Amino acid sequence: MHIYILGSAAGGGFPQWNCNCPNCHGVRTGTINAKVRTQSSIAISENGVDWILLNASPDIRQQLFDFKAAQPARKLRDTGITNVILMDSQLDHTTGLLTLREGCPINVWCTEMVYQDLTTGFPVFNMLKHWNGGLQYHQIDPKQAFKIDGFENLEFLPLIIQSAAPPYSPHRHDPHEGDNIALIIKDHKTQKQLFYAPGLGKIDDQIMQIMQDSDCVMIDGTLWTDDEMQQTGVGKKTGREMGHLYISGEGGSLSYLNQLSTPKKVLIHINNTNPILNEDSAQFAELKANDVEVAFDGMQIEL
């Protein structure tokens, strides 16, 4: 399985266009050791030619330009992207579908709850239905594994996770199964497994076992502390209120990752306020000392 990190930041990217927090100001001025990052999305493939997008970021045009394998140039209009899987209906994971409209029809895999959001609160399926067949909806049963034509060796097992529907969702404060999923992606040729959960509000015993059984875990790294948005003065909500488990301290994701002995451990969906973006920070050093990597745009993993 080929895994390519198209974007590794949370919504707004890094630096966020209107933010002058220490991280954003520092990366703009070159006064901190940090990489510019686009909004989170990854691509996976079993042959290096045909690719599946996991989430469609608002930055998708630039991401695909930087990702040369996405353009095999076999004909006048071409792309290596054949399918899109949506983990949720968050704007930073779905607005890229609008940019992909020239490639319609496009196969889009998502749960019924995500499809409801994308035909009501943010009706992108409706908007694109006249674009050469539009978005072709394939329903994900959040309790059942599925396969995608052309990717015979890959199996996708959804996992219902605790997080939150987006603010625009008609059921923002009425959670349903399928609002957010994680994915266990198994490559039956190499017998390797990826656990992908860019939006993760809680780690329970089931998720711990799945992570231990995986060869690579790529999980939510939005915030270092639960009150980070408040402490930096950029917001009023905690991480948990937004559906994101913080990294540090008791009950943070790092305390769980440190219990894993086998898999490669990667944090993705990093908010612009998170001190781990500064590679000279104590927080980045702490992750490195615990063999936890911070995803960056262009990062590649082979399983």
From Swiss-Prot:
Q: Extract the InterPro entries matched here.
A: Metallo-B-lactamas (IPR001279), PQQ_synth_PqqB (IPR011842), RibonucZ/Hydroxyglut_hydro (IPR036866)
UniProt pathway: Cofactor biosynthesis; pyrroloquinoline quinone biosynthesis
Show the SUPFAM superfamilies listed in the entry. Answer: Metallo-hydrolase/oxidoreductase (SSF56281)
Asked if Transport is a keyword of the record, the answer is yes
Q: Which domain of life, per UniProt? A: Bacteria
List the protein's name.
Coenzyme PQQ synthesis protein B
Function text: May be involved in the transport of PQQ or its precursor to the periplasm.
Q: Which PANTHER family match?
A: COENZYME PQQ SYNTHESIS PROTEIN B (PTHR42663:SF7), HYDROLASE C777.06C-RELATED-RELATED (PTHR42663)
Q: What are the UniProt keywords, alphabetically?
A: PQQ biosynthesis, Transport
Alphabetical GO biological process terms: pyrroloquinoline quinone biosynthetic process
- What is the similarity comment for this entry? Belongs to the PqqB family.
Q: Which gene encodes it?
A: pqqB
Species: Acinetobacter baumannii (strain AYE)
